Every structure is written in C-alpha cells, then in structure tokens.
Curated annotation (Swiss-Prot):
Belongs to the UPF0325 family. InterPro entries: UPF0325 (IPR020911). Disulfide bonds: none annotated. It comes from the Bacteria. HAMAP family: UPF0325. This is UPF0325 protein PBPRA2971.
C-alpha cells in the first residue's frame, strides 16, 4: 500500500503519527514519529537523510552562465506524499517566525555540540 515507506524500512506505516522535514547543508532530514504505546514515556521515531539533487540552471543565455541549485530528492517527494495520506496532514501556512526560531535553536544545539567535540579533540593533543 505504501511502497516508498516500506522501501526505507518502515514496516508498519499505519503506526505513523506525524513527521518533520528540515534541510541541513546538502541533505534533507526526514524524521518520522510513531504513535506512543501504552506505558512508554516517549514516542519512537526514526530519522532518514536524503541528499539533495544538484542541478545546473541556465541563468543568462547570452553569456551561457549557469548556476548550480539543489532540490528535494525525487524519492523523498514520493515518501512525503505517502506520509501526507497517512497523517492527513493539512497544508497550512506555518508561522515563518516560529519556523526560523526553531531552525535557529536547532542550529545552536548543533554548533554547541560541534564546538564541544572540537575542544575535546584539542585537549587530546595537549
């Protein structure tokens, strides 16, 4: 019924509760959350990385100037279509400020973790 979801290892698509999608460098990160079972504190989730597809687009035909852009992986679009069917997701306008703040907080955590990792590596060199 959901061939693209099963192709990435999701065996029980009917247990999917929601999903999130974000872009990180040259990848799209899909996180799928499953319904929480009785007695569990946290819902189970799985994360997938999809490399963005690179494409050269003609910017100026006179100078034959090209610009490289990235776009969402075609397989990922099929997976999202199936997830939308399952979650009956309503495509509503997301508060842009809330999204930017969320992305900023995530970036802060990633950078903080990376700084700690680099500092630990420096300590090993002393």
């Amino acid at each position: 019924m959901y061939p693209h979801l099963t192709s990435i290892g999701i065996e029980q698509p009917e247990a999917i509760e929601r999903y999130s999608l974000r872009q990180e460098a040259a990848n799209d990160i899909l996180k799928v959350y499953f319904a929480k079972n009785k007695g569990e504190l946290f819902a189970k989730s799985v994360k997938f990385k999809f490399p963005r597809q690179r494409k050269s687009v003609l910017v100026n035909s006179g100078s034959r100037e090209y610009k490289e852009i990235t776009e969402i992986n075609r397989t990922l679009t099929h997976i999202i279509d199936e997830l939308d069917i399952i979650t009956k997701r309503k495509h509503t306008e997301v508060d842009i400020k809330k999204k930017i703040l969320g992305d900023l907080r995530h970036l802060e955590r990633v950078v903080s973790h990376k700084i700690s990792e680099i500092e630990a590596d420096l300590e090993k060199l002393k």
